[in-house]
Amino acid sequence: MIPRVIRLWLPSALFLSQVPGCVPLHGPSTITGAVGESLSVSCQYEEKFKTKDKFWCRGSLKVLCKDIVKTSSSEEVRNGRVTIRDHPDNLTFTVTYESLTLEDADTYMCAVDISLFDGSLGFDKYFKIELSVVPSEDPVTGSSLESGRDILESPTSSVGHTHPSVTTDDTIPAPCPQPRSLRSSLYFWVLVSLKLFLFLSMLGAVLWVNRPQRCSGGSSSRPCYENQ
């Protein structure tokens, strides 16, 4: 059976271990690297953890954080593309990622391994770090874009030199409305002519109907009027 004092103290210790101000590890909360490049992060610890093992794990929960690389001395330790080195002189240890990939983006923790009989009930110390990875610019693609930009700029400059000729070319479409205005004028005059012809025809018909009639039996020069 656990003594009452321990039962009261244990939850308090667990609570204090979760308070940010009580965590004896410090470092950047977020780091960002580019694909294909290397990225280093340093975590600082307290003097009392100078001789303890340090490790780097992947995961957002302490109990499920998967160890990636661990060191027990100042010698560099490598696991694939990840290295860790302890610097006891300045109380820091550095984790370096080489040739970053987009799959490396995740939540990580820098941690100090605490033994069960070390006065801290064996609770390891953790500090959470978010790693973001962004795509990198391909130098070849960049040079290709520069070449393409130069190629595009060359015709632009030549067009600028030949601007007067381009201006004259732009004035060539100006006469295009002339046939349209000519057709409009032609339609107008045809319409006027038709109306004039119709008017003259009607006038001629009226004059023809109202012309003076001449008697057939009399003088040809004397008109013949009805109802004399």
Swiss-Prot record:
Write out the topological domains of type Extracellular. 25-187
- Give the record's glycosylation annotations as residue positions: N90
Per the UniProt record, the site (Interaction with TYROBP or FcR gamma) maps to K195
What membrane topology term does the record carry?
Single-pass type I membrane protein
Signal sequence annotation: 1-24
Check the record and name the SMART domains matching this protein: IG
Q: Which residues form the Ig-like V-type domain?
A: 25-126
The biased composition feature labelled Polar residues covers 154-170
Q: What does this protein do?
A: Acts as an activating receptor in mast cells and macrophages.
- Family statement drawn from the similarity comment of this UniProt entry: Belongs to the CD300 family.
Q: What is this protein called?
A: CMRF-35-like molecule 4
Which organism is the protein's source? Mus musculus (Mouse)
Question: What phylogenetic lineage does the species belong to?
Answer: Eukaryota, Metazoa, Chordata, Craniata, Vertebrata
